[in-house]
């Protein structure tokens, strides 16, 4: 194998596939990146047990030449070292040449590296998926969905299915849900689909996979195809395939958890409320419990307090809009609510309570496409 390639494009693609490579794998060849050069361009692949990423660099795009393939072939090179090398090379062009026994020369300007490669035939093949369940989303929307849900997945492996985000489609609406059993984040969005009958549920994508995918997605309206099978999902971008395994197990039915009516409710400015809770958390965080207390005072005002006996107390009154219903005193995990407020994209939010010991709902005031649910904290 022998090719010359543009350094910037190569570095970008090596970075993408490196996201799928784990140094802790039990299969030695998966610590490497597979590189294939043929008459169409160069293909890079990185994989671990959860994620596989394949990117393709065409010979040319528009009037720009990306790569010149002088001899077709393939090699597997140790990912961590290889990624560091190509980042640091001095010139705009990189030449890669595989000789006998998989020894690979990487040349740029006066810099020359010789790396020991591995047999590419031993690298596992990527799955070929049946494309029966396919739908489309703009990259920006998917990036938003991930940002607004994945923070709420569980970090505990005691219930592995809760470490992922549940995707389901019904009546042309994609609903994505994440919960760690103390909080829940949900986002809904209409989708383009190739089949009017397309419906599925219990498609649980690991949070780790979605975090890595989010780093690759652009903030644009370019559509990507999402393919769902029994145990894998595939995100098809231009010149990139991103595979993720699905988590096994039955995801809890969350629709019934969300209260339909409220005993106390109000609206509040998102940023102002976030800043109030962040100030309160300064004390409750020191007490390690992260508990913040909220009490209705009347005249549209609620009081936010946090107490750490050995340090002190903070109290702040917050003006609300439309405060109505019963008097309320409630305690909650401040960090969980702050995490949710940081991903809300509306200027104001509505908060609905059904009692001091019942879950409460936080949602944007200007649309019904997302909501957050929180369990209160018992403080006595």
Swiss-Prot record:
Superkingdom of the source species: Bacteria
SMART domains per the UniProt record, alphabetical: POL3Bc
Gene3D superfamilies assigned to the protein according to its UniProt record, in alphabetical order: 3.70.10.10, DNA Polymerase III, subunit A, domain 2
Principal location: cytoplasm
GO CC annotations, alphabetized: cytoplasm; DNA polymerase III complex
Keywords: Cytoplasm, DNA replication, DNA-binding, DNA-directed DNA polymerase, Nucleotidyltransferase, Transferase
A family per Pfam: DNA_pol3_beta_3
InterPro entries on file: DNA_clamp_sf, DNA_polIII_beta, DNA_polIII_beta_C, DNA_polIII_beta_cen, DNA_polIII_beta_N
GO biological process per UniProt: DNA strand elongation involved in DNA replication
One annotated GO molecular function: DNA-directed DNA polymerase activity
Localisation: Cytoplasm
Keyword Nucleotidyltransferase: yes
Family in the record: Belongs to the beta sliding clamp family.
Subunit organization: Forms a ring-shaped head-to-tail homodimer around DNA which binds and tethers DNA polymerases and other proteins to the DNA. The DNA replisome complex has a single clamp-loading complex (3 tau and 1 each of delta, delta', psi and chi subunits) which binds 3 Pol III cores (1 core on the leading strand and 2 on the lagging strand) each with a beta sliding clamp dimer. Additional proteins in the replisome are other copies of gamma, psi and chi, Ssb, DNA helicase and RNA primase.
Main function: Confers DNA tethering and processivity to DNA polymerases and other proteins. Acts as a clamp, forming a ring around DNA (a reaction catalyzed by the clamp-loading complex) which diffuses in an ATP-independent manner freely and bidirectionally along dsDNA. Initially characterized for its ability to contact the catalytic subunit of DNA polymerase III (Pol III), a complex, multichain enzyme responsible for most of the replicative synthesis in bacteria; Pol III exhibits 3'-5' exonuclease proofreading activity.
Protein name per its UniProtKB record: Beta sliding clamp
Native organism: Halalkalibacterium halodurans (strain ATCC BAA-125 / DSM 18197 / FERM 7344 / JCM 9153 / C-125)
């Amino acid at each position: 194998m022998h090719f010359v390639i543009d350094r910037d494009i190569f570095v970008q693609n090596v970075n993408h596939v490196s996201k799928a490579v784990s140094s802790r794998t039990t299969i030695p060849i998966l610590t490497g990146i597979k590189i294939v050069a043929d008459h169409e361009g160069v293909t890079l692949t990185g994989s671990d047990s959860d994620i596989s990423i394949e990117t393709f660099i065409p010979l040319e795009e528009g009037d720009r030449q990306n790569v010149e393939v002088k001899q077709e072939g393939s090699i597997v090179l140790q990912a961590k070292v290889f990624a560091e090398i190509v980042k640091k090379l001095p010139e705009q062009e990189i030449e890669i040449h595989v000789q006998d026994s998989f020894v690979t020369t990487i040349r740029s300007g006066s810099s020359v590296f010789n790396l020991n490669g591995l047999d590419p035939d031993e690298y596992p093949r990527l799955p070929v998926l049946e494309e029966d369940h396919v739908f489309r989303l703009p990259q920006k929307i998917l990036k938003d969905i991930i940002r607004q849900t994945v923070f709420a997945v569980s970090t505990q492996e005691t219930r592995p299915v809760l470490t992922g985000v549940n995707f389901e489609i019904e009546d042309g609406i994609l609903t994505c849900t994440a919960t760690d059993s103390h909080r829940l984040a949900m986002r809904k969005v209409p989708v383009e689909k190739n089949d009017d009958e397309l419906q599925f549920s219990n498609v649980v994508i690991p949070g780790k996979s979605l975090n890595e995918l989010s780093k690759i997605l652009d903030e644009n309206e370019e559509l990507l195809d999402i393919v769902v099978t029994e145990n894998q999902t595939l995100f098809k971008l231009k010149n990139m395939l991103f595979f993720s395994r699905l988590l096994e197990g039955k995801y809890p039915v969350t629709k019934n958890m969300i209260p339909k009516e409220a005993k106390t409710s109000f609206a509040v400015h998102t940023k102002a409320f976030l800043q109030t809770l962040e100030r309160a958390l300064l004390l409750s965080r020191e007490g390690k419990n992260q508990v913040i207390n909220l009490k209705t005072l009347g005249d549209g005002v609620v009081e936010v307090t946090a107490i750490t006996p050995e340090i002190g107390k903070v109290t702040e009154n917050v003006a609300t809009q439309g405060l109505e219903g019963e008097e309320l005193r409630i305690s909650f995990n401040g960090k969980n609510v702050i995490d949710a407020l940081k991903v809300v994209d509306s200027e104001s939010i509505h908060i609905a309570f059904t009692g001091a010991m019942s879950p409460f709902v936080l949602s944007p005031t200007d649309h019904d496409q997302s909501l957050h649910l929180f369990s209160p904290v018992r403080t006595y």
